[in-house]
């Protein structure tokens, strides 16, 4: 019998082993759809981004006009831009749900997969930040100024580092040029890291909602999960096009319709919605270096989760106390997101400070304690 090309060709067999004949737990739920959705987000962003880059000019005098030109004069330029801008929001929705799934079901115990995933999140955040600067509107300029300025809080080398990053003494033309270069480069780094992420995942195989070894009950990825994934793609792309066509500016800041002006500061400088939780934590500490450290810790704490797992069970499926704590954490993050969008005044300051403290306490103290308590309860 002739050998099956799908199983023997050097390139096709890699695709076959990751997308066709991959043994998959039979009981994974829709929460396992978000990995492939993130892949679709990445492909969509790279394609729309490439088309936008073809019409964009990375120069302070022309950037804003070039984006306006794309929307007015390029065939479907308005659609490409709206898909790209809102695609970023969907990327973050999917990655936050994907991380939440990993946290709930103990997927972080695959340490290499988890750590490459957190690295992917950091790279995505960097990409979104430099991308937001490119249209060179008011919020682009002032957002870039405020966030890059945080590096000056680093002792001794801070100021030198910031001026080196800016390419001058303020955010200006050199900054915009290098941010464009970085925004073009980083998505390909994300694509490379994604392959590493998948390589580590396929070493161990997928986790499942029960958190138990599922080797005795695996089914092929295709057709079962390929079909399930396509349904996910359809739903997400439908939501994305609906947002991009009906209210493309819903999640944007009106300040960005005004060209960047270094002489006029917007009344409320705030990042896009997906950074608001971290921004709220940054603002809740009345010290520059302290705020920067808390901001970094709010995301880097994810690297610690494998070491904070004290439970005898992997997932939270049969751990009601941990479930309660998990949803408290979700609610806490929503409160932080809301506070981050509000002005710095009473009562938002104290709410932000309480929510920031609670965020760290839940992850660092309450989760391990609750796990230990649940272990004790298993004995009775």
Curated annotation (Swiss-Prot):
Heme b b562 binds at residues 84, 183. Component of the ubiquinol-cytochrome c reductase complex (complex III or cytochrome b-c1 complex) that is part of the mitochondrial respiratory chain. The b-c1 complex mediates electron transfer from ubiquinol to cytochrome c. Contributes to the generation of a proton gradient across the mitochondrial membrane that is then used for ATP synthesis. This is Cytochrome b. GO terms for molecular function: metal ion binding; ubiquinol-cytochrome-c reductase activity. Its cofactor is heme b. Heme 1 (or BL or b562) is low-potential and absorbs at about 562 nm, and heme 2 (or BH or b566) is high-potential and absorbs at about 566 nm. Keywords: Electron transport, Heme, Iron, Membrane, Metal-binding, Mitochondrion, Mitochondrion inner membrane, Respiratory chain, Transmembrane, Transmembrane helix, Transport, Ubiquinone. Heme b b566 binds at residues 98, 197. A ubiquinone binds at residue 202. GO terms for cellular component: mitochondrial inner membrane; respiratory chain complex III. It holds the Pfam family Cytochrome_B. PANTHER family: CYTOCHROME B. Binds 2 heme b groups non-covalently.
């Amino acid at each position: 019998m002739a050998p099956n090309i799908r199983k023997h060709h050097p390139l096709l067999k890699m695709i076959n082993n990751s997308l066709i004949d991959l043994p998959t737990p039979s009981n994974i739920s829709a929460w396992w759809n978000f990995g492939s959705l993130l892949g679709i987000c990445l492909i969509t962003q790279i394609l729309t981004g490439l088309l936008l880059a073809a019409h964009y000019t990375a120069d302070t005098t022309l950037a804003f006009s070039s984006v306006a030109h794309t929307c007015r004069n390029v065939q479907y330029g308005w659609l490409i831009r709206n898909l790209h801008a809102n695609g970023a929001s969907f990327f973050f929705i999917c990655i936050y749900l994907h991380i939440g799934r990993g946290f709930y079901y103990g997927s972080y115990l695959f340490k290499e997969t988890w750590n490459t995933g957190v690295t992917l999140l950091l790279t995505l955040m960097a990409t979104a930040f430099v991308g937001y600067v490119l249209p060179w509107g008011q919020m682009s300029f002032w957002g870039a100024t405020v966030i890059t300025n945080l590096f000056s809080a680093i002792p001794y080398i801070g100021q030198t580092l910031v001026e080196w990053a800016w390419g001058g003494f303020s955010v200006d033309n050199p900054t915009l040029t290098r941010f464009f270069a970085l925004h073009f480069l980083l998505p390909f780094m994300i694509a490379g890291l994604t392959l590493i992420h998948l390589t580590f995942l396929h070493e161990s195989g997928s986790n499942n909602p029960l958190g138990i070894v599922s080797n005795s009950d695996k089914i092929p990825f295709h057709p079962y999960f390929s079909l399930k994934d396509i349904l996910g793609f359809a739903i997400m792309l439908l939501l994305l096009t609906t947002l991009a066509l009906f209210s493309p500016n819903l999640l944007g800041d009106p300040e960005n319709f005004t060209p960047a002006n270094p002489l006029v500061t917007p009344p409320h400088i705030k990042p896009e919605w997906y950074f608001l939780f971290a921004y709220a934590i940054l603002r809740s500490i009345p010290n520059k270096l302290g705020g920067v450290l808390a901001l970094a810790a709010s995301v880097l704490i994810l690297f610690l989760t494998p070491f904070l797992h004290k439970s005898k069970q992997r997932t939270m499926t049969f751990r009601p106390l941990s479930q309660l704590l998990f949803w408290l954490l979700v609610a806490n993050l929503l409160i932080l997101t809301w506070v981050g969008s509000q002005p710095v005044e009473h009562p938002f300051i104290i709410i932000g400070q309480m929510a920031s403290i609670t965020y760290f306490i839940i992850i660092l103290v309450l989760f391990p304690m609750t796990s230990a308590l649940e272990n004790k309860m298993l004995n009775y």
